[in-house]
A protein has these predicted regions:
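Active-site helical microenvironments for divalent-metal-assisted chemistry
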Residues: 1-160
């Protein structure tokens, strides 16, 4: 149990690869991103969705990255899903069903969490642009293209 817990917390040390590639100073960790998604979920989760399930998906969707690392669309992602599934089976087999649900986008909760994933990226891009004077429009455009309403409007409102 002790070793498992320490491995999970290793996600705090895995930096978000997209921010590193973009040259962001002191980029967030994958764990910080998952926390950001969870906070957004608490604030934005529609009442018809199961909030506990949404939070579970937020917190474990990137857990395999403690083993496989954070991959971006610029990396070879041809085996990403199977590598992450294998890693989750090793790390926390009791949560493998959550990763499968998220990867397959099998429920309304999983679809919502995928939108939160992109929303968090877009909001974080705005934070970095403001704090570091960078052009991260690539990330903002990606987020806008990946989310539907009301999140697209929320991104627009936050950018103004």
């Amino acid at each position: 149990m002790r070793e498992d817990l320490l491995r999970y917390l290793g996600l705090k040390d895995v930096l978000r690869a997209g921010w590193v590639r973009a040259g962001v100073v002191s980029p967030e960790s994958v764990a910080a991103h998952s926390w950001g998604m969870a906070v957004l979920a608490l604030k934005l989760c529609p009442p018809e969705l199961d909030l506990l399930r949404v939070l579970q998906l937020c917190l474990v969707h990137d857990l395999p990255e403690v083993v496989v690392g954070d991959l971006t669309p610029h990396d070879d992602v041809s085996t990403k899903a199977e590598d992450e599934r294998r890693a989750m089976g090793d790390l926390a087999p009791e949560w493998l069903h959550l990763l499968d649900e998220y990867t397959a986008q099998a429920t309304a909760e999983a679809v919502f969490v995928k939108s939160l994933d992109k929303l968090d990226m877009g909001l974080q891009a705005m934070r970095y642009e403001h704090a570091q004077g960078m052009d991260l429009s690539e990330f903002l455009n990606s987020a806008r293209n990946a989310v539907g309403e009301p999140f697209r409007g929320l991104l627009d409102d936050c950018e103004e």
